[in-house]
């Protein structure tokens, strides 16, 4: 058994998985755990592991968000966890100051020249004004796409407002919606495939090199 109690970017658990050793990795942040999950899935086709300490279903996500309403530190961990679902890089790099409406970033394009701004909402009350705000942020920042990542299902006016932003076109690729509403439920099921990006580049979380298949099973703790 290989134990890494401060697994960070996951180098040790990656090596243990490659050597077909049983392993346990532990880290204190959801961002690190999300990074390691992605690294293992990218590198090993049939990897199996259990992650403890993160929401496993929508009820768990709602519980985590509710705790964050009373504890800002916990809220930031919810935000980082939500961003990790779609492999987005935190927009404020973990700082707790004003984020100017930018909770996360995704990059795309042949040279990673494109940028999608992510806004995370954990509250029960979401509305069309938030979609307008996100549209204003991407226009201010010169970003191509805005992603509204929400725990609560969007209303019809929100969906209509997002559709009104039109399409983003990158030469050589199919157009995608300029404003995309993605629920946490969708992100938990589809991961980074929940967001439509042309020629996506995972600059926030570099893709691990593909390793030979292994059937070993590990465990990842938070």
Where are these regions (language model features)?
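Mixed-charge (Asp/Glu-Lys/Arg
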Residues: 24-222
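Extended, hydrophobic alpha-helical segments in both membrane/secreted and soluble proteins
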Residues: 1-32
């Amino acid at each position: 058994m290989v134990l890494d109690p401060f697994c960070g970017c996951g180098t040790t658990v990656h090596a243990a998985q490659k050597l077909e050793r049983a392993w346990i990795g532990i880290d204190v942040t959801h961002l690190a755990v999300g990074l390691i999950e992605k690294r293992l899935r990218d590198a090993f086709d049939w990897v199996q592991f259990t992650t403890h300490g993160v929401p496993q279903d929508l009820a768990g996500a709602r519980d985590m968000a509710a705790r964050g309403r009373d504890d800002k530190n916990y809220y930031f961990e919810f935000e980082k966890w939500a961003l990790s679902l779609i492999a987005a890089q935190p927009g404020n790099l973990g700082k707790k100051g004003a984020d100017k409406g930018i909770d996360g970033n995704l990059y795309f394009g042949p040279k990673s020249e494109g940028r999608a701004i992510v806004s995370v909402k954990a509250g029960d009350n979401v509305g069309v004004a938030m979609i307008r705000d996100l549209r204003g942020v991407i226009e201010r920042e010169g970003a191509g796409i805005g992603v509204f990542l929400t725990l609560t299902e969007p209303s019809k006016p929100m969906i209509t407002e997002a559709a009104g932003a039109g399409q983003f076109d990158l030469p050589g690729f199919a157009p995608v919606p300029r404003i995309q509403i993605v629920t946490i439920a969708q992100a938990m099921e589809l991961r980074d495939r929940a967001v439509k990006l042309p020629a996506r580049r995972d600059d926030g979380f570099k893709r691990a090199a593909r390793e030979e298949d292994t059937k070993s099973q590990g465990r990842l703790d938070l």
